[in-house]
A protein has these predicted regions:
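Short, acidic, Ser/Thr-enriched surface-loop or helix-capping motifs
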Residues: 272-273
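Core AdoMet radical
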Residues: 40, 60-69, 83-98, 109-127, ...
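Short cysteine clusters
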Residues: 49, 53-56, 266, 281, ...
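Short loop/turn motifs at secondary-structure junctions
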Residues: 52, 84, 111, 138-139, ...
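Radical SAM enzyme [4Fe-4S]-AdoMet core and its adjacent flexible, acidic
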Residues: 150-266
Length: 327
C-alpha cells in the first residue's frame, strides 16, 4: 500500500457509501451515546505543521493559517480556570509551532494535575531546547506519533527523513528523563496502521515496540496506544482515490464493538478549536460537527459539558468503536 505524495480532501457532500449510518446503527441496537463526567479539556492550537502526514484527519501542514491567537487563548485559559479539568491535552497540527505555546503551558500547569502535549518528533529534533526544558520543568506528559518500526512504512506516512529524526528525538527525550524507568516524566507513543486495516493488538504492539526500540536504539517509553486511522482528512482522500473508502468503512462497521462505548474519549473529553469553539472530540472538529450541533464559544460557558448531554456522531465514529476501540 502506498499513500499519495500529497492529498487534499475534496469539497462537497459526502458519498453514499451504502452502509448503515452510525447514528442509525446505535438506534437499532437501542444505544445512545451521551456524556459521562467530562474530565479532560483538549485544546487544538491550530493546523500549522512542518509535515503533511498522509493519515492526518485535519490535513495539517506548513501552508495552514488556522492558528490560535492570544485573545482566544486567554478565553481558553479562563475556561480552564473556571472548570478545573483533571487533564488538559494540547494538540494540533504541531502545537509547538504556535508561538504562544510557552505562555500557555506556564498558565495551564497550575490549573490541572495532568498537562499533556502531542508534539511532532521531527520538530523536537530541531533545536527547541527551551521548549523541552519547559516541558520537563512542568512535568508535561509527552505523547508522540511513531506509527511503525519499519523505516519505509513510517516515511510513507510521515515523509522522507522522518524515521531517523523521530528516533533521534525519542533518544533526546530519554536523555531528559522522559520515558526512562524510575522517572516521573512520562513519554507515550501512538501507533497506527500504515495500510487500510485495523491495528494489531495494543498489548502485542507495545511489547514489540518496547523490545525493538530498546534493543536497537536504547529507547524507552511508558505506554503505547494502537489507534485506528479515522476516515477523515488526507486518509479519507487516499481511501477515495484508491477505491477503498466503501470497503474501509464497511470493515469498521462490521467490527463495531458495543463494549467500546463505555470508554470512548468523547464521553469524558471536550475539544476546543483554534478559534475557540467547542466539539465533542478532535475528530468531530475535523468533521465540522460542533458540540450540541451548534457553535458554542468557550467564553460562553463556565463548566464542563453536563453528564447525559448528547454527543454529535457521524460515520467516522465507526473508527472509534471498531474492535478494541479508540479511547
Amino acid at each position: 500500500m502506498n499513500f499519495p505524495v500529497q492529498a487534499t480532501v475534496p469539497k462537497g457532500p459526502e458519498r453514499d457509501l451504502e452502509i448503515v449510518p452510525f447514528s442509525s446503527h446505535l438506534a437499532r441496537l437501542g444505544l445512545r451515546l451521551t456524556r459521562q463526567t467530562t474530565t479532560t479539556l483538549q485544546i487544538n492550537l491550530g493546523l500549522l505543521c512542518n509535515q503533511r502526514c498522509l493519515h492526518c484527519h485535519h490535513e495539517a501542514g506548513p501552508d495552514r493559517r488556522e492558528v490560535m491567537d492570544l485573545r482566544t487563548m486567554e478565553d481558553v485559559i479562563l475556561y480552564a480556570g473556571r472548570a478545573r479539568f483533571q487533564a488538559i491535552d494540547l494538540t494540533g497540527g504541531a502545537p509547538e509551532m504556535n508561538p504562544l505555546l510557552p505562555n500557555l503551558i506556564q498558565r495551564l500547569s497550575p490549573l490541572t494535575p495532568r498537562l499533556m502535549i502531542r508534539p511532532n518528533l521531527t520538530l523536537l529534533n530541531q533545536g527547541n531546547e527551551d521548549l523541552l526544558g519547559l516541558l520537563k520543568r512542568h512535568r508535561v506528559v509527552v505523547l508522540v506519533s511513531f506509527p511503525s518500526l519499519d523505516k519505509k512504512e513510517l516515511e510513507i506516512q510521515r515523509g522522507k527523513g522522518a524515521f531517523p529524526e523521530s528516533v533521534a528525538a525519542l533518544k533526546r527525550l530519554n536523555d531528559l528523563g522522559f520515558g526512562r524507568k524510575g522517572s516521573d516524566l512520562e513519554l507515550n507513543l501512538i501507533s497506527n496502521p500504515t495500510e487500510a486495516c485495523l491495528p494489531k493488538s495494543q498489548e502485542q504492539e507495545e511489547k514489540r515496540f518496547r523490545q525493538e526500540l530498546k534493543n536497537r536504539w536504547n529507547v524507552e517509553f511508558n505506554r503505547l496506544f494502537a489507534f485506528t486511522n479515522v476516515p477523515l482528512g488526507r486518509f479519507q482522500h487516499w481511501l477515495s482515490q484508491s477505491g477503498q473508502e466503501e470497503n474501509y468503512l464497511r470493515m469498521l462497521a462490521q467490527n463495531f464493538n458495543p463494549s467500546t462505548l463505555e470508554g470512548l474519549m468523547c464521553r469524558s473529553l471536550v475539544s476546543v478549536s483554534w478559534d475557540g469553539y467547542l466539539y465533542d472530540c478532535d475528530f468531530n472538529l475535523a468533521g465540522n460537527l460542533p458540540m450540541g450541533h451548534r457553535r458554542i464559544h468557550v467564553s460562553e460557558i463556565d463548566a464542563p459539558p453536563a453528564p447525559g448531554s448528547s454527543i454529535a456522531v457521524s460515520d467516522h465514529c465507526y473508527a472509534c468503536t471498531a474492535r478494541s476501540g479508540f479511547t
